[in-house]
């Protein structure tokens, strides 16, 4: 789960001697918003497509645009979630990875981050989703786990989020069974507010609904 484990080796890097035109060409070819600028393995910063497009002279070299570079980067030995934070903060489709000496290791793409997040969240595991709402003091992971296990289920992934304006605490559970109606009923019996659930019952209902819509369309 470290950033160095998810570096994309195919991402190009720019030099200070590269022109605006060449940089834009690479950005378009690789469909990214930024590219790293490197000098003798040292990371100098990210240059954005927006800043490049603002230049009237495509023959201008990147040496003259250093004041626009995003100099932030993430370290190679930290958790990948820091890369997600970087991407959101800078609205960048590339996250540069460096060591303590700012030596450039490579970049993580947002498309790769999405796949990593999917694995991290258990998105590829078959199961059901239950979303609970509660006051923060009501949250007890031990009690939630007990109710899940009492219904012969296991938690694949658990995520929490707080609405800072209301103080409401949201808990999203991904469990290993699709038939979750008994588990939902168990939460409701224990006075949990079940905001949303998605299991085999809803999946089958959606299939039936889509089939009926298709039949109506074919009858037109």
What annotation goes with each model-predicted range?
Residues 33, 93, 154:
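Short acidic/polar active-site loop segments enriched in Thr and Asp
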Residues 47, 108-109, 175:
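A conserved hydrophobic position in a structured secondary element of the catalytic/binding core
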Residues 28-31:
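N-terminal, positively charged regions that mediate nucleic acid binding
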Residues 1-26, 37-39, 43-48, 57-88, ...:
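Bateman/CBS regulatory modules and CBS-like beta-alpha motifs in cytosolic regions of diverse proteins
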Residues 52, 101, 105-120:
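Short, structured interface segments
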Residues 85-88, 115-118, 146-149:
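A broadly conserved amphipathic alpha-helix scaffold signal in soluble, globular proteins
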Residues 127-220:
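A conserved regulatory-domain signal marking ACT and ACT-like small-molecule sensing domains
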């Amino acid at each position: 789960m470290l950033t160095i484990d998810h570096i994309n080796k195919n991402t190009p890097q720019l030099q200070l001697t590269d022109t605006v035109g060449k940089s834009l060409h690479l950005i378009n070819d690789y469909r990214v918003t930024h590219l790293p600028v490197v000098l003798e393995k040292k990371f100098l910063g990210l240059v954005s497509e927006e800043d490049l497009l603002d230049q009237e002279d495509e023959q201008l070299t990147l040496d003259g645009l250093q004041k626009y570079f995003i100099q932030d980067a993430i370290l190679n030995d930290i958790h990948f979630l820091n890369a997600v934070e970087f991407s959101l903060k800078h609205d960048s489709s590339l996250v540069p990875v460096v060591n303590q000496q700012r030596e450039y290791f490579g970049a993580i793409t947002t498309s790769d981050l999405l796949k990593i997040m999917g694995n991290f969240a258990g998105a590829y595991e078959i199961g059901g989703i239950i979303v609970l709402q509660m006051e923060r003091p009501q949250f007890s992971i031990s009690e939630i786990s007990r109710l899940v296990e009492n219904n012969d289920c296991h938690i694949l992934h658990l995520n929490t989020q707080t609405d800072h304006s209301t103080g409401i605490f949201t808990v999203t559970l991904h469990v290993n069974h699709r038939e979750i109606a008994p588990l939902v009923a168990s939460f409701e019996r224990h006075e949990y507010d079940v905001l949303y659930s998605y299991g085999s019952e809803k999946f089958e209902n959606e299939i039936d609904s889509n089939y009926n819509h298709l039949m109506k369309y074919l009858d037109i």
